[in-house]
A protein has these predicted regions:
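Extended, low-complexity, turn-rich repeat/linker tracts enriched in Gly/Pro/Ser/Thr and Asp/Glu
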Residues: 48-56, 103-107
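Residue-level signal for short segments within beta-strands and strand-turn junctions
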Residues: 48, 61-63, 113-115
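Short, solvent-exposed loop/turn segments enriched in Ser/Thr/Gly
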Residues: 37-43, 91-93
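Intrinsically disordered, low-complexity Pro/Gly/Ser/Thr-rich segments with frequent PxxP/GP/PP motifs
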Residues: 65-96
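Short, surface-exposed beta-strand/strand-loop-strand elements in extracellular ectodomains
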Residues: 51-73
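C-terminal interaction-tip segments
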Residues: 1-37, 101-117
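Buried hydrophobic-core signal for structured, non-transmembrane domains
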Residues: 42-47, 96-99
Length: 117
């Protein structure tokens, strides 16, 4: 099914996804290939919950087996927050927003998005 024409929207559902970030690329938001929806990502915050050590984060848009970096190995200082998204963008059908950390259990993510159909 094709993604909806966002001029003729029927439903907009606000959502929030949360995730402890690991050292393997893992999706925080996935728009399945035949969803009939488009996802509007409004905010992505990465918190370093380790009180001592800095940690790096990589965020990518994964499309058709290819990772397109939004941020690549950006340092998140201990006890700090990184605001990754400065302006909203869309995840089309088949797209995922993935996160990878340099150290497991140091970083957590909160992502606010809308499912549009």
């Amino acid at each position: 099914m094709a993604a909806p024409n966002i001029v003729n929207v029927v439903t907009i559902t606000g959502k929030t996804a949360v995730q402890a970030i690991t050292t393997s690329a893992t999706a925080i938001v996935t728009n399945s290939a035949a969803s009939g929806k488009v996802f509007k990502v409004n905010a992505l915050y990465i918190s370093n919950v380790d009180g001592t050590n800095n940690a790096d984060v990589t965020v990518d848009l994964f499309r058709s087996s290819t990772a397109y970096r939004i941020v690549n190995t950006v340092v998140v200082p201990a006890d700090a927050v990184l605001d990754v998204i400065s302006k909203s963008f869309y995840l089309e059908e088949g797209d995922s927003l993935r996160l990878t950390a340099s150290a497991a259990s140091d970083l957590e993510a909160v992502c606010s998005y809308e499912e549009i159909s």
